[in-house]
Amino acid sequence: PRGYPTPMWASATMGGYFGAELKYAGYDGIIIHGRAPAPCYLLIEDDRVSLEDAGDLWGKGIFATQQALKARHSPHHQIATIGPAGENRVRFATIAHRLNNAIGNGGFGGVLGAKNLKAIVVRGTKGVPLADPQGFLQAVRQVWQMAKGGIYRIGKPDAGYPHLACTHACSVRCFTRV
């Protein structure tokens, strides 16, 4: 397949606990500007944010990097990292989290490599305050009512749920168009 044209707009998603941990640290997102002069990783621990030396990690694969950073910090830290493909700015390089989650679309691993950013390591202990506790409980009750009919019916048009939209991850008809 052809590489992405430039300039481009890309988006990707990643499963796992990284996003939740970032929120627990008090952040909704991360914007990274510029390029570090040497390999580093971004360490976020609640309100403390720093760039740490990653010279010893540069050249390592994603699993070895995750293991080294877990040993350096804690098993509770969530880590998103790149491997040699990202370091070398391969256009389809991924960012990996845990053993089975990755951002694989758009070459975001190469973007981190271009910034000399080996990994983002996050630990949050703040929790997430609810802006509307009563509204949240009402939404929980609504989901509970839908789930009472069986979890395999949730999200299917024949279940009679209003305003159901087909998305790229929907299995209703989209999987027949692959």
Protein language model regions, located:
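Intrinsically disordered, low-complexity segments enriched in small residues
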Residues: 1-13, 17-178
